[in-house]
């Protein structure tokens, strides 16, 4: 996505200031529908106070809304970022792919959202027509791992900055998959709960 420039009266009323556009650009590139402050800070690598001011301005302009679980991108924000909502766009290395029982996906996704795994810290999620993508990032922001849930498949992708060891992403993905397996194993023992952000995505 190109930097946002104010071109006309209507556009200038809609577009955020140039100093905020990089945040919206990353949100658009990641197709984020929801995220946490700390996750986005790691992704961007900027100071907490700077990000706090930017998010406050974007919230005031109705591009974002703050919730008890972090931030969600509003319809206005998705329009600005050009979020297609047509499906996950592959941009990483496939670390693992497996078939899953689709009827439990909503509950498992709910159990994963917001959790940390080894070096992975929760970043946020995106929604697609046939599922959801959950995203984690390391403390320094150099490794990102995405768990892509469709109706009957889980794909784990890794994105690694130059100079990072692929084995670290592989090890982190195995920790994540181990927890996912336990959630599926516990599916017959726990009452069903679906996180509000995953409702309407999976039919359970």
Where are these predicted regions, by residue range?
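Short acidic, hydrophobic short linear motifs in intrinsically disordered regions
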Residues: 32-43
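Short alpha-helical segments that sit at the start of domains
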Residues: 1-25
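Charged, low-complexity intrinsically disordered regulatory/assembly segments
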Residues: 119-204
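A short, conserved structural fragment
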Residues: 59-69
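Short Lys/Arg-enriched alpha/beta "domain-start" segment
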Residues: 84-133
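Accessory beta->alpha helical hairpin/"wing" motif in late/C-terminal subdomains of nucleic-acid enzymes
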Residues: 68-82
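Basic amphipathic alpha-helical segments that dock to polyanions
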Residues: 27, 40, 51-61
């Amino acid at each position: 996505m190109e930097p946002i420039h104010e071109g006309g009266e209507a556009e200038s009323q809609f577009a955020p200031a140039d100093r905020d556009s990089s945040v919206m650009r990353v949100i658009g590139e990641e197709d984020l529908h929801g995220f946490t402050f700390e996750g986005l800070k790691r992704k961007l690598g900027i100071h907490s106070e700077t990000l706090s001011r930017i998010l406050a301005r974007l919230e005031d302009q109705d591009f974002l809304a703050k919730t008890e679980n972090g931030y969600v991108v509003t319809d206005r924000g998705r329009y600005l970022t050009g979020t297609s909502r047509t499906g996950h766009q592959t941009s990483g290395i496939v670390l693992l792919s497996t078939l899953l029982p689709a009827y439990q996906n909503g509950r498992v996704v709910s159990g994963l959202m917001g959790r940390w795994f080894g070096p992975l810290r929760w970043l946020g999620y995106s929604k697609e027509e046939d599922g959801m993508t959950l995203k984690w990032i390391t403390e320094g922001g150099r490794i990102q791992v995405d768990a892509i849930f469709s109706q009957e498949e889980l794909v784990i992708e890794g994105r690694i900055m130059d100079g990072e060891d692929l084995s670290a992403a592989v090890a982190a993905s195995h920790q994540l998959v181990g927890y996912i397996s336990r959630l599926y194993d516990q599916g017959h023992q726990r009452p069903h709960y679906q996180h509000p952000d995953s409702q309407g995505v999976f039919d359970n």
